[in-house]
A protein has these predicted regions:
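Glycine/Thr-rich phosphate-binding loops that ligate phosphate moieties of nucleotide
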Residues: 36-248
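Short pre-catalytic strand/loop immediately N-terminal to key active-site residues, enriched for Gly-Thr
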Residues: 2-3, 199
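Conserved active-site beta-strand element of glycosyltransferases/polysaccharide synthases
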Residues: 25-26, 35
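Conserved phosphate-binding catalytic cores of ATP/NTP-utilizing and phosphoryl-transfer enzymes
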Residues: 6-23
Length: 248
């Protein structure tokens, strides 16, 4: 018998023990996602975010997943590594390079929508753009930092839509992987969104396995299933520098 089924983002949310209204998960691979749970039926009338049944939805207990997707996330960071960063630089080197530049990248702005149509923009395909460059002032480090900041700002634009639907995004659960390995990315996301970020040692494949185990009765309840979930790190918003982040 089939004990569980779910897509990649519900699996990721499940792996992070995200089941109840107000709980939020995120991932930041090739594309980036913020996924939250609603306890009532709601939707964005422009379909900029998707609403569908979460893994624990029943007729008696409404549990809907709301999914924000930003296509130009890790793919932009990878493009920046190939085309902008110094030859041989890895992602950790890029983070060190970007750290040499102040918040806001001295006015350089990267709009990260270069991976096809974006649902959050009502399926418009506007492309990626880089602006604000001064040939006498800016270099590779500015573009590397601005790319990560642009991704964060696009996340926050979509999160505002989710908040308009009644979601309280005060805490984000994520696996410590992909762009969440970047201190710059996660610190900027926490400080711009105002949300605490909790990083865990898990991924979507673990979620699929846990879901199957819960469905098959191997675990007596969710508490038992996630008793071994390991929290690795907590990132708080930088309230001291919040004005700098918001001005950027």
């Amino acid at each position: 018998p089939l004990s569980y089924r779910g897509g990649d983002q519900p699996n990721n949310a499940l792996s992070l023990n995200v089941f109840n209204p107000g709980e939020i998960s995120s991932s930041a691979g090739t594309s980036g996602v913020v996924y939250g749970v609603l306890g009532d039926v709601n939707y964005d009338d422009k379909s900029r975010v998707n609403t569908f049944a979460h893994v624990n939805h029943t007729a008696e207990q409404t549990r809907l997943g709301v999914l924000l997707c930003i296509n130009g996330t890790g793919i932009l960071n990878a493009w920046t590594r190939r085309n902008v960063a110094p030859e041989g630089n890895g992602y950790a080197d890029m983070n060190d390079l970007a750290a040499q530049v102040p918040i806001g990248s001295d006015g350089v702005c990267v709009v990260p929508f270069g991976n096809g149509a974006e649902r959050v923009l009502e399926n418009k395909e506007i492309g990626c753009s880089i602006s604000g460059i001064n040939f006498n002032k800016h270099g590779k480090a500015h573009i590397v930092r601005a790319a990560q900041e642009g991704i964060v700002f696009s996340f926050c634009y979509g999160m505002e839509i989710m908040q308009q639907m009644g979601m309280d995004i005060s805490k984000i659960h994520a696996g410590k992987a992909n762009m969440f390995l970047s201190p710059l990315f996660r610190n900027t996301l926490a400080s711009v969104s105002g949300a605490t970020i909790e990083l865990y040692d898990t991924d979507g494949s673990v979620g699929a396995a846990k879901g199957a185990g819960i469905g098959a009765g191997i675990y007596k309840d969710n508490k038992e299933a996630f008793s071994t979930l390991d929290k690795l790190q907590v990132i708080e918003p930088d309230v001291v520098r919040s004005e700098e982040y918001m001005a950027a």
